Structure formats: structure tokens, C-alpha cells
Swiss-Prot record:
Its main location: nucleus. It comes from the Eukaryota. It is found in: Nucleus. Pfam families: Wap1. Involved in resistance to ionizing radiation. Keywords: Nucleus. Present with 721 molecules/cell in log phase SD medium. The gene is RAD61. The lineage of its organism: Eukaryota, Fungi, Dikarya, Ascomycota, Saccharomycotina. This is Protein RAD61. It comes from Saccharomyces cerevisiae (strain ATCC 204508 / S288c) (Baker's yeast). Transmembrane segments: none annotated. One of its GO terms (cellular component) is nucleus. The keyword Nucleus applies. Residues 66-82 have a biased composition (Polar residues). The keyword Nucleus applies.
């Protein structure tokens, strides 16, 4: 057992003489000393016990207890190891008289002879320290008690002063009426309700964008999910009213958590899009090489194609950045790059305001890509990028730059004269028009009435003839396309005479009228708009001055059959406009056939009655139709009068 300084263990002896002995605190042991002392003491004790019977030592047990307690000195406990040894032996050694102590005095002191001369003087550590502490404590305790009493007295006086001030303030307050208290309570209740409603409303209106992040503990997340499950289980056992309230509370409590989950699903794309949009310039602020720029746009395009959620996120939050990156560089001799730029602009732009300033020149260059220029291998594209570009073409179904340019022009509001000229050239090309007819038709519908468009075709009639020929070639295959029928109606309304347009008039009228006869009686709601457009186109053709339509007998017979059915079945008020336009077309065909109409006076009279009613209805909103009805009525009245005279 080791001993370290004054705090180390000290060997205690149970013997005590009446004379002053060195205190236990004055004795220190090293490791070797302790090991040598313990056997000597134990041998001495055993020899003394053998000479003197143990009964003699136990005559006065109470005195022995008092002496052992006084031996402890200044609150010292005996050594635990010696006590444990004595307990194991079940032997208690107690001094009972001065004779026994005198007998063992020499024996005890002889055990400490080896300590003589080890040091000239010993430092009194523990005893002196304890006495010093006791003296200091005895001298300081009265002062501390005085200071504590003064502090407590001051605090008590300050508290009493505050208490008196509050009592004085309360006593000075006027007595309040019950009405005032009731109003105050009502206002507080209303305020609580408004705060609760506002908190519910704001919790539902919380918005999360790309710049807001909220941390949530995993344990809290599990608690929320557990609460949701418990909430659903509890609502099943309640009545209908309680169920509705519980559902509202559940929706309110989980609204914030669900918004966090949705925000996490979208923020996961932020690093990807920021990486793709970064490094558009090199470290020295110069433009990156064209092949690296092409690779960056290609990777961004493939990401948009492969991941729809990524595309929606990029379009919502990074639309301007994508357009800016797409037009950071432009090379007219790099058609593959122009195609990628057109694709990205077509995907993310929503209106004309999203287009770059150089849109006119760019779109014209983009329209030159008809798919043939990509047969040559570009020197700017590396092998891996070339393979990725072929993958891009396959996934976009090999759409050309012409397709993207036509789509962008349709979105554009006011087209420049250069773009209109470019559209006219493209539309007059038979091969290009047939391949992109679905894209050309909506664009031509918007341009056909433009003054620049009309003047250009007047100056270049051969281009106008090519356009009309392309429209006629596609007409039979696009009878259900409302935009194509509108274009032909607008062209037939023009006063400019064009031989190419009217030489196909018989074919157009025949195809349109057959479509009308198939659906007009009975007429479904889905077909109303298309049938009205076909009736208007046929009316423009058959009502034209000096019109000489060559129709077969079957078409005339079918028209007469439908006319008779409609007359006998009565007027359908819901489709009055459709019936009136059909009667008007039928009247102009009677005028062209003249003696071959084969109508009896009764049917002719009914036709006159229907046209008169139709004229009164249309005169208020369409002057052109009203004038044509007047022409048809004059002719039919002359026929009806002559037939009555003949009869």
C-alpha cells in the first residue's frame, strides 16, 4: 500500500497512554516503512495478549470505547485495512488501566525506533493546518454572520418597500364596473380566436423555395409519423362531427411536415442544375472552348429528357439561367450546337418575353436545319459527345431545327419581316411543307391576314401558287383540321384572283360537302364547329360570281334528301345557324343548276320561308351572310313566280 504525503493512509494503534504521544498526523510512512511496521506491531500485540489474558483487558468496555474515540483526535477515522483485519479475527483490543498501557508503552515505542535520525525536523502538516483553520473559522464566523444578517435585512426592507408601493397603487385604482370587465373578456376571446385562425391560415400558406431550408430532428420526424397514425386510429372511433374536426386538426398538424417532404424532393435537384449551369467561363474569365460548351449543353439536354421532375424544377426556378447559358456562345458553322440551343429554348420558354435579343437571326439559322446537314461529322465534336448527341436525336424522335423554329415562331407575337419572308419560302417548299404540315398550319393561320404577307404574295405570285398547291394537296387528308379550313376561308375571302386556288374549287367543294352530309343530320355537339367551318368554305366557293361548279348527280341527290328531311322534321332551334347555312348553300346550287333543280312549288315555298327567317336573324351580326341571303332570295322568288305562272 502506497502513501503520498500528508493525505496518504496512516497506521493507527489502539493503545493510548496518559502522557502526550506524538500525534498520528505527525507521522508519515513511505512504502517500505509501512511494510516493515505492520509485522512488528502485530507480533507485539500477539505477545502481549499471550502474557496477559484478554479477560483482564475487557473489564471496562465503556471506558475502552471512550478512550478509543478520544484517540481519534481531530475527526480522524482509523485505518480501514487494520480495522478489517481486526474484524476478521473477531478480536477487540481495548486498554483498561494505566498499568496495562505502561506495560505496552515500551513495546509500542520500540517499534518506531527506526524513525529516529531520519530527519532533523518534521513539518507539522495536518495538525497545524487544522488548528489554523479552526482559528480562522472561529475568527471569521462572527463577521460572516454579521454581513449575512445585514444583507438579509436590506433585502427584506426593499421587498417591504415594493410591497407597500404596490398596495398603495392598487388602493388608488378606481372601482371597475362589471360591464367593462365583460367587454374586456369578450375582446380577449375574440383576439384569441383571430390569432388561432391566422395561425391556421398561415400554416396552410407557407411557401418553400430554393433558398429556404429547415432542419428537423429524426426523432421528431418519427414522433410526427406516430402521432399521425394515432390520430387516424382515434378518428375512427368518434362520431361524424368529431371526425370532421379531427381530420381538420390532422391536416393542420401534418401540413408543415408534408411541405418539408415536398421541399426535400425538389431541393435534391438543386446541386445538379447548379453544377450544369456553372463554369460557363474559365478561371481567367475567358470563354470556354466550343467543344466544352457543346458538351455542357448536351448534358443539360439529356438530363431534361431523362428526368421529367428535374425538368419541371429547372424550368420553375432556373429558366432565365438556362436561357442565358444556352446563348452564351453562337456559331453559325456549328449546326449541332444551334439545334441544342433551339431545343432548350423551345423547352423552357413560355412566352415571347423569354426570347433572347438575337432571336430573329438565331431562329432563321435554326430553320436551315432540315436533317440533312447532320450527315457530315463535325470536327468540334469528340467521339463520346458524338455518341451522346446521337442518343439525344433518338430520344427527341429526330426533330429538326426547322420544327423548333416553327414552334418558336408560333409562340412569338409580332414577327419581323425577315421571319415572314423565311416562313413564306419554307411553306412554298412541297417537301418541307408535307413533312411539317402540322406545324406550318397554325403558323399560316396567324400570318395569312398580315399585310406584309399579302403584299409579298402579290409581288411574288409564283410563291403564292406553290403555297395554295401545298394546301390543296393536304386538304383531303386534313378535313378535320379546323386551322386548315380557316386558312382556305381566309384565302377565298381575298379579292385577289388566283388561278391555282380556284382550279381546285370543285374538289374542295365536293370534299367539304360530303363531310357536311355525313354529320349534319343528326348533328352532334362535337361536330358543330367543324361543320360550320365547312359550310362557310362551301358558301364562299358556290356564292362567288361567275362560279361554275361541276358536281356529280349523286352529291345533288344527297343534298336534296337532307333538305327534305330537315324541312319535314322542323327547325332545330339549337342548330339554327347550321341549318340556315345549309339552306343558303342549297339555294346557290339551285341557281347554278337552274332547270335541273327538280323542286316542286311546295318545297320551294318552304325554302323561301326558311331563308326569310334566317335573314332576319343574321342581319344583326353578319352583314356578308345577310347580303348573300338577299341574292339567293331574289333568285328563288323569280323561279317560284315563273313556275306559278307556268302552272
Amino acid at each position: 500500500m502506497r502513501a503520498y504525503g500528508k493525505r496518504g493512509p496512516v497506521l493507527r494503534t489502539p493503545f493510548r497512554s496518559n502522557k502526550g504521544l506524538p500525534s498520528s498526523s505527525d507521522v508519515e510512512f513511505s512504502d517500505d516503512d509501512v511494510n516493515s511496521v505492520i509485522p512488528d506491531v502485530s507480533s507485539t500485540i500477539s505477545s502481549s495478549i499471550a502474557d496477559h489474558p484478554i479477560e483482564g483487558l475487557l473489564d471496562e468496555p465503556r471506558k475502552a470505547q471512550d478512550s478509543s474515540s478520544s484517540f481519534d483526535g481531530a475527526n480522524e477515522k482509523p485505518s480501514s485495512q487494520l480495522d478489517s483485519k481486526r474484524n476478521d479475527q473477531n478480536v477487540k483490543i481495548i486498554t483498561s488501566s494505566d498499568t496495562s498501557m505502561a506495560f505496552m508503552k515500551d513495546e509500542k515505542l520500540s517499534a518506531f525506533n527506526f524513525l529516529d535520525g531520519s530527519k532533523a525536523s518534521k513539518r507539522k502538516r495536518r495538525r497545524t493546518y487544522q488548528k489554523h483553520d479552526a482559528n480562522i473559522t472561529s475568527s471569521i464566523e462572527p463577521d460572516v454572520q454579521d454581513e449575512d444578517s445585514i444583507t438579509m435585512h436590506n433585502e427584506f426592507e426593499s421587498i417591504r418597500k415594493i410591497y407597500n408601493d404596490i398596495n398603495e397603487f392598487i388602493l388608488k385604482l378606481p372601482r371597475a364596473d362589471d360591464d367593462i370587465l365583460n367587454k374586456m373578456l369578450e375582446n380577449e376571446m375574440k383576439m384569441d380566436d383571430s390569432i388561432e385562425n391566422n395561425s391556421i391560415r398561415t400554416s396552410k400558406d407557407k411557401k418553400y423555395g430554393k433558398f429556404r431550408t429547415i432542419l428537423i430532428n429524426k426523432n421528431k420526424e418519427n414522433e410526427i409519423m406516430g402521432e399521425e397514425v394515432d390520430q387516424k386510429a382515434n378518428t375512427l372511433s368518434l362520431n361524424n362531427a368529431d371526425n370532421s374536426n379531427a381530420e381538420k386538426e390532422g391536416l393542420t398538424s401534418t401540413n408543415h411536415y408534408n411541405e418539408l417532404k415536398n421541399m426535400g424532393d425538389t431541393i435534391k435537384y438543386q446541386d445538379d442544375i447548379e453544377f450544369l449551369l456553372s463554369n460557363s467561363k474559365s478561371n481567367d474569365n475567358t470563354t470556354v472552348p466550343i467543344n466544352e460548351y457543346f458538351k455542357k449543353l448536351l448534358n443539360l439536354s439529356l438530363m431534361i429528357i431523362n428526368d421529367e421532375e428535374f425538368f419541371q424544377y429547372a424550368k420553375r426556378y432556373f429558366k432565365k439561367e438556362i436561357i442565358k447559358l444556352s446563348f452564351a456562345q453562337f456559331r453559325s458553322d456549328f449546326p449541332e450546337l444551334i439545334l441544342l440551343q433551339g431545343y432548350l429554348l423551345h423547352k423552357v420558354s413560355e412566352s415571347q418575353s423569354d426570347f433572347p435579343p438575337s432571336f430573329d437571326n438565331f431562329s432563321i439559322e435554326l430553320s436551315k436545319d432540315d436533317g440533312k446537314i447532320r450527315t457530315k461529322k463535325n470536327k468540334h465534336i469528340k467521339k463520346l459527345s458524338h455518341l451522346n448527341f446521337e442518343d439525344f436525336l433518338r430520344k427527341t424522335q429526330f426533330k429538326t431545327g426547322l420544327y423548333y423554329s416553327l414552334s418558336l415562331w408560333e409562340m412569338h407575337g409580332n414577327l419581323s419581316l425577315d421571319i415572314i419572308k423565311r416562313i413564306s419560302i419554307l411553306a412554298s417548299n412541297k417537301d418541307l411543307f408535307s413533312r411539317h404540315v402540322k406545324t406550318f398550319i397554325p403558323l399560316l393561320e396567324k400570318l395569312i391576314t398580315a399585310s406584309e404577307f399579302c403584299h409579298m404574295y402579290i409581288e411574288q405570285p409564283e410563291m403564292f401558287d406553290s403555297l395554295i398547291s401545298n394546301l390543296n394537296n393536304q386538304f383531303k387528308d386534313m378535313l378535320d383540321d379546323d386551322s386548315l379550313i380557316k386558312i382556305l376561308i381566309l384565302l377565298t375571302n381575298m379579292e385577289v384572283h388566283n388561278y391555282t386556288l380556284w382550279k381546285e374549287a370543285d374538289m374542295i367543294f365536293q370534299s367539304s360537302m360530303n363531310t357536311i352530309l355525313e354529320s349534319i343530320h343528326p348533328l352532334t355537339d362535337a361536330k358543330v364547329d367543324n361543320i360550320l367551318l365547312h359550310l362557310g368554305l362551301c358558301l364562299n366557293i358556290c356564292s362567288r360570281e361567275n362560279s361554275r361548279l361541276k358536281l356529280d348527280g349523286k352529291l345533288w341527290y344527297d343534298m336534296k334528301t337532307i333538305f327534305v328531311k330537315m324541312i319535314r322534321d322542323g327547325s332545330d332551334t339549337e342548330n339554327r345557324l347550321v341549318q340556315g347555312l345549309f339552306y343558303l348553300n342549297f339555294s346557290f346550287l339551285i341557281k347554278q343548276r337552274k332547270e335541273n333543280s327538280n323542286l316542286d312549288p311546295g318545297e320551294l315555298n318552304l325554302l323561301l320561308v326558311e331563308l326569310e327567317a334566317f335573314k332576319s336573324e343574321t342581319s344583326q351580326f353578319n352583314e356578308g351572310i345577310s347580303n348573300k341571303i338577299e341574292i339567293a332570295l331574289n333568285y328563288l322568288k323569280s323561279i317560284y313566280t315563273s313556275e306559278r305562272i307556268t302552272i
